[in-house]
Amino acid sequence: MHVKQGSKKLLLAAAVAASSLNAHAGATINFGEDKSVSVGLGMRYSFTSAEDAAPNGKDRSSDFNLDSARLYFGASLNKYIKGMFNTEWDGDQIRVLDAAGQFAISPEFNIWAGRLLSPSDRANMAGAYYSMGGGYWPGVASRYGYNGGIFRGRDDGAVVWGNVADGKLGYSIGAFEGRTFGIGSLTQSQAKNAGVKSTDSLMYAARLQYDFWDAEPGYYGTGNYLGAKDILAIGVAGRYQKKGVLVVGDKGDYASYNVDFLMEKRFKGSGAVAFEAAYYDYDTDDVIESEQGKAYSAGLSYIFEQNVGWGRVQPFLHWQRFNPDTNIDTKQYDAGVNYVIDGYNAQISAMYSNTKVEGTRSLDKFVVAVQLQF
């Protein structure tokens, strides 16, 4: 497709504007034309009171926890060659989160290779730092994501992505190691050690998204724009790996797909309302039926335009359901409020959550969390 130079400049400007919302504050040192290094820090800390989670198994817990601590590093060699290296605290040690070379040929065509998120649903591409609800992660419905991958949903591989049609149509397609779905199956090395023989096939993943209102340029996404944009978007994503599900005594193909929707509308002088919804279908080739089935999620929020003290108030609601082939459903309801001080760089959230697994009684928890990025 031929794109005029003026359109390319507009797309680049839009990409810069978008990255200002879903990027940490950070610090950048320039040492030549299009040459720079950047560094940043992100952290989330929380207090949780959960039903029956005390050591005696019957009282409420009272726990402070460092949920996440990240170091962000970026570098630019020239206009076209860049890289990222990010780390994450996993509760015991610092691990590599992202490590990828980035070749920015044009807004319509980019190549990233290394350890990174593979194409998937909006929730996974946004991650816990950039989702509606301050650290919220839809782990009931989005089964492959924060709990999957080599670490925090990441995998080793390469992806081609871009934004065409004036930035309104985003695409991404890639090949990855896979077999790290977080569903109880064996990884390639674990299967080899257990004597489970299988072909060494790759996992293929792709995503296609169309923005009817404002464009959303870039690869990693945002779950909620906090009133900064008017968004009406629908996305479709899928993954497939031949013999991607390995257990002792059995193996099968892995396949999943999802459809997700986001609508966010600003009302001048008042605020912005947002609604999100997603549908998921997971297929483990009948090897792990507890992770094979359908899932659903939905969310609603409203952010007020006027500040209250330092920041803006954003109440939100979430609902999730996973219906596996074992018919042991899991449902979760969340209600809370965010206090947005500086976009995703400074937020305080309070959330009540209720989770119900079929055949057991429901359990609730209350969480207060602080998120900071520098």
What are these regions (language model features)?
Residues 186-192, 218-225:
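Low-complexity, polar-biased intrinsically disordered regions enriched in Pro/Ser/Thr/Gly
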Residues 2-4, 28, 32, 57-58, ...:
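Outer-membrane beta-barrel pore domains
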Residues 27-54, 58-181, 198-216, 222-227, ...:
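Outer membrane beta-barrel
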